[in-house]
């Protein structure tokens, strides 16, 4: 048995989980609704305030799907109940972020500002011009949007300039030591 897959997913109050016969899982909660199609090789059942994920056989691919399916359902339940937040920090002279409506405008030292439209299901929040929070109920989407923002200026190892995640540690390098 998968260590992750054998654990049931607890359903908190205010959250409803429904599973169709073709393994489409719908999770509704106070923050919204998520729908995801899961593999037909896995059995998903809702039993008294928990979701139980089981498998029919022990083939390698089915064992891998077992833990994955349970983790995806857990992420959906957490998302509609609490939501997800990824915080990015802009480090560098003149690196700024601001909101224009639902659009995020980044000044990153290019000759032009970088504009990013908010994808449906994701919203931006800017704190002090150098912190950007990406919020949403879909963990995968929040992480993808945060990675898209970070990719514009990845942190460089010499001065640490760039866009980094809040708790990310940048491995620093020593510069050249000049002739003596």
From Swiss-Prot:
Keywords recorded for this protein, A-Z: Ribonucleoprotein, Ribosomal protein, RNA-binding, rRNA-binding
Gene Ontology molecular function: rRNA binding; structural constituent of ribosome
GO biological process terms on file: cytoplasmic translation
Keyword Lyase in annotation: no
InterPro entries the UniProt entry points to: Ribosomal_uL6-like (IPR000702), Ribosomal_uL6-like_a/b-dom_sf (IPR036789), Ribosomal_uL6_a/b-dom (IPR020040), Ribosomal_uL6_bac-type (IPR019906), Ribosomal_uL6_CS (IPR002358)
UniProt keyword Ribosomal protein present: yes
A GO CC term assigned to this protein in UniProt: cytosolic large ribosomal subunit
Annotated Pfam families: Ribosomal_L6 (PF00347)
Family membership: Belongs to the universal ribosomal protein uL6 family.
Entry function: This protein binds to the 23S rRNA, and is important in its secondary structure. It is located near the subunit interface in the base of the L7/L12 stalk, and near the tRNA binding site of the peptidyltransferase center.
Self-association and partners: Part of the 50S ribosomal subunit.
Record protein name field: Large ribosomal subunit protein uL6
Species whose genome carries this gene: Clostridium botulinum (strain 657 / Type Ba4)
Organism ancestry: Bacteria, Bacillati, Bacillota, Clostridia, Eubacteriales
